[in-house]
């Protein structure tokens, strides 16, 4: 499952990226992009109630602290509110929401007010093209600029610091990074949904390894639309494998360690998993756009329950989410980005 590290690449990879795809069939690339978009968004005919009586019998005790809706359009430079936001990064006490449909990043305060808008209006070099994931290393923001096959590194004020082309030489399509995680070593990982791979790079943008076969697969061989990524304290990577309905665990060197989850709409099953986050206790949180819930698993993959009711104490209450996608955990709080223009902040139970 692991491809040997590539050596001798230019750190930024931009020249290689320009040469890499001269023979790509444009129509084929567009078709693949459409398939990926459909798998990632899954926003058509979304349920307002959680399916499966078995699922509703397992409620994880997280409490809603804040619900932030789209800022008023009249306070934004473009005059448009959120358009399918996809992810969030928490940097200190600062919240950065990736507003994918508008190709911009919004910094919000804790009440949802817009503090700054990061896009080409703020810096002409900040050209986002359908970016789907954002993360932080504690100092900088990292953005998976999906439509440009690259990862951008930005200051919290939006100034571009680095730009890394991503992808494996010889793959049939340009990379489409839709998941992103940053290690405490300075390495970063991306999921390439176009070529069914997970890629790890060092801080200079050199490819360290590539996991996956380069085609749709399952089991230990590979992925079928890899998406959200998270790292545990040991440096193991957790990969959301959307169309296989599972989460795959990889060692720091890319070796396959195991998986959990299965396709379905009952307890512990995953219908359209999107993103993953891990708390300090090692519990794994997986957003599911079709179940309109966040499923929770223990460090040993034991199913612990779901988050998704307006009132966790009332199993008959309505659904909290419509299309949960991007996740982040900071301290004892879980941040959930809903594609229907909302951010939810939840207090997690004390797991010490």
List each model region and its residues:
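Eukaryotic scaffold repeat domains enriched in small/polar residues
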Residues: 2-352
């Amino acid at each position: 499952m692991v491809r040997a590290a590539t050596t001798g690449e230019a750190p930024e990879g931009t020249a290689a990226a320009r040469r890499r795809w001269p023979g790509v069939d444009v129509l084929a690339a567009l078709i693949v992009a459409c398939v990926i978009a459909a798998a990632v968004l899954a926003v058509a005919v979304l349920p307002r109630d959680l399916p499966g009586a078995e699922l509703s019998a397992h409620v994880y005790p997280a409490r809603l602290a804040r619900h932030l809706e789209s800022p008023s359009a009249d306070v934004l430079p473009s005059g448009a509110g959120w358009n399918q936001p996809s992810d969030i990064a928490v940097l200190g006490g600062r919240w950065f929401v990736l507003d994918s449909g508008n190709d911009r990043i919004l910094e919000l305060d804790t009440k949802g007010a817009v503090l700054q808008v990061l896009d080409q209006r703020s810096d002409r070099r900040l050209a986002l093209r359908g970016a789907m994931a954002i993360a932080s290393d504690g100092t900088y923001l990292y953005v998976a600029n999906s439509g440009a096959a690259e990862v951008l590194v930005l200051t919290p004020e939006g100034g571009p610091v680095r730009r890394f082309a991503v992808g494996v030489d010889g793959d049939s399509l340009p990379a489409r990074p839709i998941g992103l995680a940053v290690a405490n070593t300075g390495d970063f990982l991306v999921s390439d949904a176009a070529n069914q791979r997970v890629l790890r790079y060092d801080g200079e943008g050199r490819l360290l390894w590539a996991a996956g076969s380069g085609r749709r697969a399952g089991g230990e061989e590979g992925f079928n639309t890899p998406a959200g990524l998270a790292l545990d304290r040991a440096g193991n990577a957790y990969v959301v494998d959307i169309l296989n309905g599972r989460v795959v665990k990889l060692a720091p060197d890319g070796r396959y360690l195991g998986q959990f989850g299965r396709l379905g709409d009952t307890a512990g099953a995953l219908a359209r998993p999107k993103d993953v986050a891990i708390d300090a206790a090692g519990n794994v949180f997986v957003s599911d756009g079709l179940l309109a819930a966040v499923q929770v698993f223990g460090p040993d993959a034991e199913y612990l329950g779901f988050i998704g009711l307006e009132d966790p104490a009332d199993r008959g209450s309505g659904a909290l989410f419509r299309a949960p996608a991007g996740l982040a955990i900071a301290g004892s709080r879980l941040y959930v980005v809903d594609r229907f223009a909302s951010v939810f902040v939840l207090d997690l139970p004390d797991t010490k």
